[in-house]
């Protein structure tokens, strides 16, 4: 499974992993797992985290080593592009339910995820995803953004 990752992705995951491997012993605790995954743009629910941990933490010692982490991230990334998850993510961003993600809505969600972005950064994210140039992101644009790597 992990062999489907690019070298760049593996390097990115290694960097994130080591940020949370505080004592440098090559393992992270399960409670740190959610934080690590969110830093990589994933947004697992508590139930998903528990499932992933149960699948990966074979000896039940509450820690995950890097190879286990890679396998899990590869599995998670493969699942992430499912249409329903993308639709659900869009609904999370589209606070007022009007079918568009505005700069304000994007800023709100990113702030809740702990990402303190400047107005310029938020505007840049909107511009990158905003194919028709109307200043906001519709569902089709969101799908394109989420599925192009």
From Swiss-Prot:
Functional summary from the UniProt entry: Calmodulin mediates the control of a large number of enzymes, ion channels and other proteins by Ca(2+). Among the enzymes to be stimulated by the calmodulin-Ca(2+) complex are a number of protein kinases and phosphatases.
Source organism per UniProt: Caenorhabditis elegans
Pfam families (UniProt xref): EF-hand_7
Top-level division of the source organism's lineage: Eukaryota
Subunit organization: Interacts (in the presence of Ca(2+)) with pde-1, madf-3, rpl-7A, tax-6, efk-1, npp-1, obr-4, sos-1, akt-1, unc-13, tag-196, ugt-48, nmy-2, F27D4.4, ddx-23, efa-6 and R11H6.4.
Family: Belongs to the calmodulin family.
Protein name per Swiss-Prot or TrEMBL: Calmodulin
Leftover remarks: This protein has four functional calcium-binding sites.
Binding positions for Ca(2+) 2 per the UniProt entry: 57, 59, 61, 63, 68
Keywords recorded for this protein, A-Z: Acetylation, Calcium, Metal-binding, Methylation, Repeat
Modified residues (N6,N6,N6-trimethyllysine): 116
């Amino acid at each position: 499974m992990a062999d489907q990752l690019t070298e760049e992705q593996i390097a990115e995951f290694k960097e994130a992993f080591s940020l949370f491997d505080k004592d440098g012993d090559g393992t992270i605790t399960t409670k740190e797992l959610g934080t690590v995954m969110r830093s990589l743009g994933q947004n697992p629910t508590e139930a998903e985290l528990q499932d992933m941990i149960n699948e990966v933490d074979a000896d039940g010692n509450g820690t995950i080593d890097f190879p286990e982490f890679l396998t899990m991230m590869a599995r998670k990334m493969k699942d992430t592009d499912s249409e329903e998850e993308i639709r659900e993510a869009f609904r999370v961003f589209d606070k007022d339910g009007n079918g568009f993600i505005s700069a304000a809505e994007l800023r709100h969600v990113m702030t809740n995820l702990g990402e303190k972005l400047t107005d310029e950064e938020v505007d840049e994210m909107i511009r990158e995803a905003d194919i028709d140039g109307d200043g906001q992101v519709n569902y089709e644009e969101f799908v394109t953004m989420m599925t192009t790597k």
